A protein has these predicted regions:
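Nucleotide-activated sugar donor-binding and catalytic core shared by glycosyltransferases
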Residues: 1-375
């Protein structure tokens, strides 16, 4: 069968590449054509256009490049129509992908969505497009099944691919050791993946660590961010930097300061107690917008999956060096706070379930397509 896959950022490229491999193992005649990235190409997809050509984040960058984004969407749709796939698989990236879903669905091509848009947090009105134009949704967060059910749409939870990535990493007996032990307890710093995010969060993280004895701060640097950018923020502070080795840092870490996102989940799956830190441009307006528009109690995936505050979250004006330090200190020794986080991680892992997310998604997609051909 012919599968057209669309992913719009680095994480989507990774998850889509694993899905391609899973489908290929189960469908020996599978062909793949992609709007995506290098990993999808390496997995066997014919790359039509790279996601970086359309990767604009934030209100003004999107508005100023709207023409490029719209022309990219038209090109994607035209290419889909010309290639005539048996299915279109969309991976996250909802702003772009839901517009593709709308057009493709009208052509009678089945649309499958792997990694649900996070409409439970933001832009819940997108459920209308999902109900109309997405044939099947495959979720990677267990609580999403209840959320979508309340909105009269059934999603299938397939497991979380981060579990797969970490299981694969830990099972590699030849994995490189990026850090050697020197007796000090490593505090991992995961300050975000984008420059704006890093510049807002890293200075406060570094300030919070000043004067704490017997720790070894290690910064896990994001891919695509040049060393000079980090150096401009760190200044003269002696902070170890590791490039391309976040899992290697987490494997050795005793505690961590982490911005929100998948990094919080990765940190928990490695069993590293953490403080979630996320600074926004501080103003009463931002706080008001957050209260009015964000529909969730928590920002970290650990707490969202667990339905409780397993890890402390310091957000916006609450994210300051004093409070970060206050929440970090109990995690640096064998305390009740540390043990409670680790117990919470165990419960979260049970909720996420075992590895195998891309395999389960692939099996369902192939089964659904076979059902269609028999009708």
């Amino acid at each position: 069968m012919k599968y057209y896959i669309v992913a719009g950022e680095a994480s989507g490229d990774l998850h889509a590449s694993n899905l391609i491999r899973s489908i290929a193992r189960k469908d020996s005649r599978a062909e793949f054509r992609c709007f995506g990235g290098d990993l999808m190409k390496a997995a066997g997809g014919t790359l039509v256009r790279h996601y970086r050509d359309l990767a604009y984040m934030g209100f003004w960058p999107v508005i100023s490049h709207l023409g490029t984004i719209l022309s990219g969407a038209r090109m994607c749709f035209d290419d889909i129509c010309e290639w005539a796939p048996d299915a279109v698989i969309l991976v996250d990236y909802p702003g772009f992908n839901l517009s593709i879903a709308q057009k493709v669905h009208k052509k009678g091509i089945p649309v499958y969505y792997y990694i649900s848009p996070k409409i439970w947090a933001w832009k819940s009105w997108r459920i209308r497009k999902i109900r109309r134009y997405v044939d099947e949704m495959f979720s990677i967060l267990p609580f999403e099944t209840d959320y979508f059910s309340r909105h009269n749409y059934k999603v299938r939870y397939v497991g979380n691919p981060t579990v797969d990535e970490i299981s694969k990493y830990l099972s590699d007996t030849k994995r490189p050791q990026v850090l050697t032990d020197d007796g000090r307890r490593i505090v991992a710093l995961l300050a975000g993946s984008r420059r704006q995010e890093i510049s807002r969060n890293l200075p406060t993280m570094l300030e919070a660590l000043e004067g704490i004895d017997c720790i070894r701060p290690v910064l896990a640097c994001a891919p695509g961010i040049e060393p000079e950018f980090y150096d401009s923020i760190i200044g003269g502070k002696e902070i170890e930097k590791v490039y391309g080795g976040t899992y290697g840092v987490l494997e050795k870490a005793y505690a961590a300061l982490v911005t929100s996102g998948t990094a919080t989940l990765e940190t928990a799956l490695f069993g590293v107690p953490q403080v979630v830190c996320y600074r926004l441009p501080v103003s009463w307006g931002v706080k008001l917008i957050r209260k009015l528009l964000l529909r969730v109690r928590f920002i970290s995936l650990v707490n969202l999956v667990s339905f409780s505050e397993v890890v402390p979250e310091l957000v916006a004006g609450d994210m300051n060096a004093v409070d970060v330090r206050e929440h970090l200190m109990p995690l640096l020794s064998d305390t009740q706070e540390r043990r409670m986080q680790l117990d919470g991680y165990d419960q979260m892992k049970d909720l996420l379930g075992p590895a195998g997310a891309p395999d389960r998604a692939a099996e369902m997609i192939i089964f659904l397509l076979e059902q269609r051909t028999r009708q």
